[in-house]
């Protein structure tokens, strides 16, 4: 196996930190109360969305917390692409009720909302003041004890050191984060994932794959992120179609949950790449589902990026399960791109146009993507012209090259 180490990467001063304790297993949710109590929490703000709450998915969590003597304050107003105003409302409730801990149950939006509420609970002002951008304030304090309980296998927010929040005034999704915002504990139970419908399984699963692929190939990659990213790719490639076909396949659900978590770890505290720069900036303008948006973009992004690091894209092909023994590096790299195109088609992911995005927006979207910090981790250099080409591929306005 070729290790594909680059001298310029070895000369960087890397860091990797895991602030989150990870506990997992089928039925793990029954341990929630005792685990949250061990963090010193006696009154928790439970952050979730209306759908999860109405479906009863959060019920066993609430029951376990109460059995452990923990008072539960419910905040079940989470929206997709959570806005600043939602975070403000949640933090006001947290302070008013004198909570001393947070429990997030749901997908990335619920977990990111809880993280951002934690920022406002421990810092002056709004989470907007702590955007990861020049001229903004860095986080100074650890958020209150946060336990994340994912009900999807996609964002990896259960272990990432970032929250993505929408500034509605700017039509812009921004990051806030670092080790101080990460969850203290995550409890991953695949039994909470069986109710995910196939289309959600598809878009969240490809999002997990996208995290792993972008973090494995990004300019900031390091050996430890390579290791977890590759394992995430292997798990997801092996299990995603099974989970899509049969939501009650617990082995597949467990494998996808592990893929999402490992892909989240591969982020570390660094950047990702073009697909997430594009989806994040697009999501601030149009209320698209993040995972579905990323999934529609991954084929064109990989088609552009493979030339930036062909050896790693060839290794990705192996992780996908492709027999590359008789292929050249270039052939294997291209095979990984075509595998992704086929996966998106097999899992019936809607195109960007079907998601409500117009080709007329390409110029604006390309400009916005260039402003996103994840652009700078991309394995192949980007400019507006490059983003323009990728977006045109998303809309089939320019010929395929692999």
From Swiss-Prot:
Under which main EC class is this enzyme filed? oxidoreductase
Q: Which reaction does it catalyse?
A: choline + NAD(+) = betaine aldehyde + NADH + H(+)
The UniProt record describes its induction as: By choline and by high osmolarity in the presence of choline. Repressed by GbsR.
GO BP of this protein:
glycine betaine biosynthetic process from choline
Quick check: keyword Hydrolase in the entry?
no
What keywords are assigned to this protein?
Answer: NAD, Oxidoreductase
What InterPro entries does the annotation carry? ADH_Fe/GldA, ADH_Fe_C, ADH_Fe_CS, Alcohol_dehydrogenase_Fe
User: Superkingdom of this entry's organism?
Assistant: Bacteria
List the Pfam families hit by this protein, alphabetically.
Answer: ADH_Fe_C, Fe-ADH
Pathway assignment reads:
Amine and polyamine biosynthesis; betaine biosynthesis via choline pathway; betaine aldehyde from choline (dehydrogenase route): step 1/1
The record, for SUPFAM superfamilies, names: Dehydroquinate synthase-like
Q: What happens when the gene is disrupted?
A: Deletion of the gbsAB genes abolishes the choline-glycine betaine synthesis pathway and the ability of B.subtilis to deal effectively with high-osmolarity stress in choline- or glycine betaine aldehyde-containing medium.
Q: Name one GO molecular function term.
A: alcohol dehydrogenase (NAD+) activity
List the Gene3D superfamilies.
3.40.50.1970, Dehydroquinate synthase-like - alpha domain (1.20.1090.10)
Q: Which family does it belong to?
A: Belongs to the iron-containing alcohol dehydrogenase family.
What is the role of the protein in this entry? Answer: Involved in the biosynthesis of the osmoprotectant glycine betaine from choline.
Protein name from the UniProt record: Choline dehydrogenase
Source species of the chain: Bacillus subtilis (strain 168)
């Amino acid at each position: 196996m070729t290790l594909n180490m680059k001298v310029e990467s070895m000369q960087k001063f890397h860091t990797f930190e895991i602030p989150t304790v990870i506990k997992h297993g089928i039925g793990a949710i029954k341990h929630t109360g005792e685990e949250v109590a061990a963090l010193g929490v006696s009154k928790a703000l439970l952050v979730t969305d209306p759908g999860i709450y109405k479906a009863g998915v959060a019920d066993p969590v609430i029951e376990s917390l109460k059995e452990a003597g923990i008072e539960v304050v419910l905040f079940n107003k989470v929206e997709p692409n959570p806005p600043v105003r939602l975070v403000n409302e949640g933090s006001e409730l947290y302070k008013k009720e004198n909570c001393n801990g947070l429990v997030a149950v749901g997908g990335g939006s619920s977990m990111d909302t809880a993280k951002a509420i934690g920022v406002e609970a421990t810092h002056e002002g709004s989470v907007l003041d702590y955007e990861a951008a020049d001229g903004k304030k860095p986080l100074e304090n650890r958020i209150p004890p946060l336990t994340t309980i994912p009900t999807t296998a996609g964002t990896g927010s259960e272990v990432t050191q970032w929250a993505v929040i929408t500034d509605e005034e700017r039509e812009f999704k921004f990051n806030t984060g670092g080790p101080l915002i990460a969850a203290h504990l995550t409890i991953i139970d695949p039994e909470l994932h069986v109710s995910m419908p196939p289309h959600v399984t598809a878009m969240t699963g490809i999002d997990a794959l996208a995290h792993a692929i972008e973090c494995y190939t990004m300019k900031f990659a390091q050996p430890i992120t390579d290791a977890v990213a590759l394992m995430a790719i292997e798990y997801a490639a092996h299990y995603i179609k099974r989970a899509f076909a049969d939501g009650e396949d617990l082995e597949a659900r467990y494998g996808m949950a592990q893929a999402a978590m490992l892909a989240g770890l591969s982020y570390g505290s660094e950047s990702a790449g073009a697909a997430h720069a594009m989806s994040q900036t697009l999501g601030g303008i149009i209320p698209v589902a993040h995972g579905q948006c990323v999934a529609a973009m991954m084929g064109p992004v990989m088609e552009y990026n493979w030339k930036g690091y062909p050896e790693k894209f060839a290794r990705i092909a192996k992780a996908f399960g492709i027999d590359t023994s008789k292929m050249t590096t270039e052939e294997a790299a291209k095979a990984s791109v075509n595998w992704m195109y086929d996966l998106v088609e097999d899992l019936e992911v809607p195109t960007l146009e079907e998601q409500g995005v117009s080709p007329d927006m390409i110029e604006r979207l390309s400009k916005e993507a260039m402003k996103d910090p994840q652009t700078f981790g991309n394995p192949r250099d980007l400019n507006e012209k490059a983003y323009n080409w990728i977006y045109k591929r998303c809309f089939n306005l320019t010929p395929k090259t692999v």
